[in-house]
């Protein structure tokens, strides 16, 4: 079947739940109290890598193609087994640590306006980058199983939606690896936040609601929680223009269109040179024109900063400093490097033509800045970072 589609000319496969294809054929009895531990019986079973290697050897290696696997239950220590080119299995594998971060961590500083640990997020991306040093990372912040990217990691309030969407775009397109984009994030689509259970299609949301009612709990609490975390937030029709159903269909869509389609849509954003969509196009071109942002090494700076994410990308003589404020409040970042020869290449506010040399950099709410650094001191500085890592 894979050969059939490759012969038709497709470019690759996104392999759903690929880490679950090998099972324990003895079907052992498992203590129900150990439910969280049963991954070992249906995920990462030893024969999994034999199957993937066979798939590569017999099919994938015969075509100019791309393969990416969904890494359910795959931890950072396991990923190299999937993507190390020497093992001849997959090109890429995406994990769920980024998606879980808001549910598994507490804010570093509640006053920052960030409702998860940015320090943990930075550590997580850094560990995964290091783990696939011999392979290739997958970078994403949203997909069909997650709420909208700008609602989850930025702010969908009118004041900050465009700025935070542009900041997140800058992050994804300056990290090492292949960035994955979910349709609508390039125009800053937001969570729809349905008020009624009848408006939801997602079986997970519906089952949570039914379970709460059956157990005598407050079903409204489920609805309130799903407004922020529910998967249907990202599954509403794509917003093309201001026409009925956002120009997506002349029929009745599976979910209601987000009412904000009258001002968040492709047609309007294409006409606005300062829009999220045009910024997205600009940064895509910027990435293509600067290979260091694709293939360069990655080095985290100011790791314990609870508001900003600062890192270096480098290859050859080119060094770039990326500074991102993930919060709705001003942040001070201390990259710890000489900024005397730095110049601004890209910023999401659109008014940073230069930056005065200083030890501490003040970033405005959700600000993103990309600097180019060309100075001999950076060579020894980055070498020292390599030793620390």
Whereabouts are the PLM-identified features?
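Active-site and adjacent substrate-binding regions of carbohydrate-active enzymes
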Residues: 1-389
């Amino acid at each position: 079947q894979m050969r059939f589609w490759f012969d038709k000319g497709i470019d690759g496969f996104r392999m759903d739940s690929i880490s679950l294809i090998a099972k324990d054929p003895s079907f052992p009895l498992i203590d129900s109290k150990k439910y969280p531990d049963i991954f070992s019986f249906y995920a990462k079973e030893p024969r999994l890598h034999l199957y993937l290697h066979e798939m590569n050897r017999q099919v994938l290696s015969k075509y100019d193609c791309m393969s990416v696997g969904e890494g359910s239950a795959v931890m950072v220590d396991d990923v190299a087994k999937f993507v190390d080119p020497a093992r001849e299995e997959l090109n890429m594998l995406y994990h769920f640590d980024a998606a879980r971060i808001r549910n598994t961590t507490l804010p570093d500083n509640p006053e920052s306006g960030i409702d998860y640990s940015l320090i943990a997020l930075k550590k997580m991306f850094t560990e995964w980058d290091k783990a696939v040093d011999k392979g290739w990372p997958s970078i994403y912040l949203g997909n069909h199983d997650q709420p909208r990217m700008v609602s989850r990691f930025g702010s969908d309030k009118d004041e900050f939606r465009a700025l935070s969407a542009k900041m997140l775009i800058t992050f994804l397109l300056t990290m090492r690896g292949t960035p994955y984009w979910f349709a609508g994030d390039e125009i800053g689509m937001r969570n729809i936040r349905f008020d009624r259970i009848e408006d939801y299609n997602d079986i997970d949301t519906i089952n949570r609601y039914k379970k709460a009612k059956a157990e005598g709990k407050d079903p409204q609490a489920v609805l309130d929680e799903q407004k922020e975390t529910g998967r249907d937030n990202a599954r509403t029709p794509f917003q093309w223009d201001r026409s009925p159903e956002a120009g997506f269909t002349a029929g009745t869509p599976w979910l209601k269109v987000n009412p904000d389609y009258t001002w968040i849509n492709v047609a309007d954003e294409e006409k606005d040179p300062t829009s999220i969509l045009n910024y997205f196009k600009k940064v895509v071109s910027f990435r293509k024109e600067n290979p260091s942002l694709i293939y360069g090494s990655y080095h985290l700076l100011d790791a314990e900063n609870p508001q900003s994410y600062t890192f270096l990308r480098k290859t050859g003589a080119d060094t770039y400093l990326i500074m991102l404020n993930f919060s709705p409040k001003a942040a001070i970042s201390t990259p710890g490097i000489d900024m005397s020869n730095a110049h601004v290449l890209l910023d999401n506010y659109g008014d940073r033509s230069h930056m005065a040399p200083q030890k501490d950099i003040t970033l405005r709410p959700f600000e993103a800045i990309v600097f180019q650094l060309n100075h001999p001191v950076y060579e020894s500085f980055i070498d020292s970072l390599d030793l620390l890592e």
